[in-house]
From Swiss-Prot:
Binding site for Mg(2+): 43, 177
GO biological process: adenylate cyclase-modulating G protein-coupled receptor signaling pathway; background adaptation; cell population proliferation; cellular response to electrical stimulus; detection of light stimulus involved in visual perception; dopamine secretion; eye photoreceptor cell development; neural tissue regeneration
UniProt-annotated location(s): Cell projection, Cilium, Photoreceptor outer segment; Membrane; Photoreceptor inner segment
Ranges where the record places region Disordered: 1-21
G3 motif: annotated span: 192-201
Protein's name in the database: Guanine nucleotide-binding protein G(t) subunit alpha-1
Region (Interaction with RHO): 340-350
Region of interest (G4 motif), ranges: 261-268
Composition bias type Basic and acidic residues, residue spans: 7-21
Gene source species: Canis lupus familiaris
Amino acid sequence: MGAGASAEEKHSRELEKKLKEDAEKDARTVKLLLLGAGESGKSTIVKQMKIIHQDGYSLEECLEFIAIIYGNTLQSILAIVRAMTTLNIQYGDSARQDDARKLMHMADTIEEGTMPKEMSDIIQRLWKDSGIQACFERASEYQLNDSAGYYLSDLERLVTPGYVPTEQDVLRSRVKTTGIIETQFSFKDLNFRMFDVGGQRSERKKWIHCFEGVTCIIFIAALSAYDMVLVEDDEVNRMHESLHLFNSICNHRYFATTSIVLFLNKKDVFSEKIKKAHLSICFPDYDGPNTYEDAGNYIKVQFLELNMRRDVKEIYSHMTCATDTQNVKFVFDAVTDIIIKENLKDCGLF
């Protein structure tokens, strides 16, 4: 009997040890949910985590982005060409009209994600046209990728034989997120599980089952969206949609005890745009100076004031540029410190 009892005790001790290890692992596991409207920069933050906290992109992985980059570049110039008609803008050189027609035809016939020389030559000629540049300046009046100017002004490099996308090229590439993408990494003794959820309206119903046991929500809102409308509804201002979404998340009963961090993203695009387009486009009551600091702060306050439990729940906010690795590294470091502090508070150690 003694031998049986000691075997049981041993088994019990092993089980206890395993449960303790599992509990410790759970305590060190951080479930991060990235939420925000479409095209706010969520997937770019995920790419940065791969660069900062994993091993970055291998040569093979970088090469896989070529087709996406060429696709993004072509879609961008086509969007500008179409907008030339809708906005009734004339080409600086009438010969570009033929180029535009040729491009439209080629776009339908080439293999997706390729960039034949004839096509890249046409795109480069179009991009230099004064009419196209005037149309590009009015990008908030139609749907255009943020990366349009970045790729189009550097197309010569992108079509050089043997081209390998740089980290920045990869960060700027855009693929609509459908479904949920999980990324795992370790940092400061914590195991992170980060979930990127599609932001377009049709994708949001998939969020609900991610809510269980979330440690922290990073809500991403594009500062530069204040003069833009939704891809899926051209009657709705993107900033208003983002505020509406933030309101429903920060006051949701599911998240009463969840840390929430607000990333006011695309500060680089915003700082350029605010020089030309007044914030009152989005907030008619705003009559402050139309500067990066004042307008940016006003937007931040609009978000933070939606928090109905301000007395007991603090929402931390950061101005971010998701394509700037150093900025994201710095901000994510601060977010991790908040998570550690909140965790210690929950354990009664803080």
